């Protein structure tokens, strides 16, 4: 006899409780059922059945269900082995143990993964500090003295690292300390068979970990292009750049996507001369207008931006880097390589057990995070999904639900994305070209920020909000923005996309004044009105 706890969605009244209870009671082997509409839950006592049968019965009755916990004899506890210890790994471990599983987590490097140690957290600290330094000399407000502050980069790095260590302890190490169902192993894992991992532990011992389910959550690392001379040069990746205690005289940034733009602009704001070198255009995967606007902003701040530039060779002598980019010969004292990231899947033995990967080594998963081997799941930057920590965490949680017999899909159709330049860059949904490729007959409107009252009050009208909608119905398809606080604005757009709102719906909503998010309302109104002819706050 075991007890299975289910999360139930879709119940709105007492009749719903009754319908769910009848559906569960009708499953052979069920002896007792308690359903709570208020708690969105059901407790089922049963013997000789799998949780999947209970989930299926609830779904057949017209409601949603997933397994939240399964209690039984210790021998029944599902064993989940997780390779990695970042956002995806911890989200999965927490959810799996909530469902009654025991977890073995294996990490070869630093606990916590990229985001807290080398990515999101330290980069945002650096960017914020650099923005404050830049504003002191470049703000637009009369009567307030403009001056260039003294920068003590070593002190900035020390404060940044202090936050990294505090968050690693609070959000990762303490979870392990307080969850007895998670066993942590420091070491390097490789599949010995579809059912077992061999672990070369950091203490020199070898261990075999056998499990019922496996999650690959090993993240990604900077990808370095095969440019002649680059491998022998002492270039920076994002990790070295974020930890650097000196400000370069001239920083050359190889790559024009998120990491390169964020860190490069931060050093620009701290006083470095910066040159961006991109093989294609800036942010080639985003709406083309975004790259063009960001280039104008960077050049106005004093950066040099080279696009469609093919670097033929790199050399470094006496502390100076030399880049041959055809007609352009560049020289600088530091080189940041920010040309993308590659999955950390080498050495895991995936091909030997039949786990399919793409050409870049990313694990191919379906919407339920399953790999080509049914009991092996993957989540986070090591997969073929977008490389954002919140996507990784959501994927890890859903993978755990599915490993425990539930049914949780990861829907990325309204995924918000943010790049933390100044102003910020954000998007959700389809670009205009993507909508055309899907034959959705899109139309678009672009609202420059001199039409947004908050931007006028900030004396910073750089950027725009662009909306893409289905021409026939007005259904919102995508939102793309370059704006101050665009990262805050975009979540409202993502919710509108999720709700299948039209531009007319958005244009008629109440938005607070003066806020940057009001730009969404104003942009939506441009599909039918000339917003320049409207009064402030016009509804």
Q: Model-derived features: where do they sit?
A:
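Flexible metal-binding regulatory segments at protein termini and peripheral loops
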Residues: 1-81, 87
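Glycine-rich dinucleotide-binding loop and its adjacent helix/turn
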Residues: 120, 216-273, 277, 304-305, ...
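FAD-site-proximal beta/loop scaffold in flavoenzymes
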Residues: 231-248, 329-403, 488, 492
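Glycine-rich flavin
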Residues: 76-77, 87, 94-101, 106-247, ...
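Flexible, glycine-rich terminal cap/loop adjacent to redox cofactors
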Residues: 81-88, 92-109, 121, 125-135, ...
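A Rossmann-like FAD-binding core segment of flavoenzymes
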Residues: 146-147, 182-202, 209, 270-367, ...
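Short hydrophobic core segments
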Residues: 81-83, 189, 208-219, 253-254, ...
């Amino acid at each position: 006899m075991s007890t299975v706890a289910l999360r139930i969605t879709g119940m709105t009244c007492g009749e719903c409780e009754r319908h769910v209870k009848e559906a569960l009671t009708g499953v052979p082997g069920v002896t007792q059922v308690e359903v709570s509409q208020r708690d969105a839950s059901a407790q089922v006592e049963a013997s000789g059945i799998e949780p999947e049968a209970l989930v299926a019965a609830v779904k057949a009755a017209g409601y949603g269900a997933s397994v939240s916990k399964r209690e039984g004899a210790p021998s029944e506890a599902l064993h989940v082995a997780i390779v990695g210890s970042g956002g995806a790994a911890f989200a999965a471990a927490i959810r799996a143990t909530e469902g009654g599983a025991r977890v073995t987590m294996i990490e070869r490097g630093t606990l916590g993964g990229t985001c807290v140690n080398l990515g999101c957290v330290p980069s945002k600290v650096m960017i914020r500090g650099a923005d404050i330094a830049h504003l002191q000399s470049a703000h637009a407000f009369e009567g307030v003295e403009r001056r260039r502050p003294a920068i003590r980069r070593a002190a900035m790095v020390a404060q940044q690292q202090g936050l990294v260590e505090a968050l690693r302890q609070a959000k990762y190490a303490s979870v392990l300390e307080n969850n007895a169902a998670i066993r942590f192993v420091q070491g390097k894992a490789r599949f010995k068979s579809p059912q077992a991992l061999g672990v070369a532990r950091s203490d020199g011992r070898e261990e075999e970990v056998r499990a019922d389910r496996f999650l690959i959550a090993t993240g990604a690392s900077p990808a370095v292009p095969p440019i002649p001379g680059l491998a022998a040069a002492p270039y920076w990746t994002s990790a070295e750049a974020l930890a650097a205690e000196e400000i370069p005289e001239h920083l050359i940034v190889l790559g024009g996507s998120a990491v390169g733009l964020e860190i490069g602009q931060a050093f620009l704001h701290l006083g470095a001369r910066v040159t961006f070198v991109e093989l294609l255009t800036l942010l080639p995967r985003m709406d083309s207008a975004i790259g063009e606007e960001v280039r104008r902003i960077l050049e106005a701040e004093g950066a040099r931006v080279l696009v469609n530039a093919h670097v033929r060779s790199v050399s470094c002598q006496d502390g100076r880097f030399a880049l041959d980019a055809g007609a352009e010969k560049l020289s600088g004292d530091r080189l940041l390589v920010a040309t993308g990231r590659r999955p950390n899947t080498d050495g895991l033995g995936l091909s030997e057990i039949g786990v399919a990967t793409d050409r870049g080594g990313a694990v191919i998963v379906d919407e339920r995070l399953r790999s080509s081997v049914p009991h092996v799941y993957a989540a986070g930057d090591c997969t073929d999904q977008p490389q954002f920590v919140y996507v990784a965490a959501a994927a890890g949680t859903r993978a755990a639900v599915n490993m425990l017999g539930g049914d949780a899909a990861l829907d990325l159709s309204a995924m918000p994305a943010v790049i933390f330049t100044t102003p910020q860059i954000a998007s959700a949904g389809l670009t205009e070209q993507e909508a055309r490729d899907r034959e959705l007959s899109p139309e678009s409107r672009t609202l420059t920020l001199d039409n947004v009252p908050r931007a006028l009050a900030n004396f910073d009208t750089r950027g725009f909000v662009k909306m893409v909608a289905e021409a026939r119905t007005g259904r919102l398809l995508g939102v793309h923005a370059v704006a101050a606080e665009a990262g805050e604005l975009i979540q409202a757009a993502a919710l509108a996309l999720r709700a299948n709102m039209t531009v007319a719906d958005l244009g008629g909503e109440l938005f607070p004044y003066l806020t940057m998010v009001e730009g969404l309302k104003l942009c939506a109104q441009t599909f039918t009105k000339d917003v320049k002819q409207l009064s402030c706050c016009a509804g």
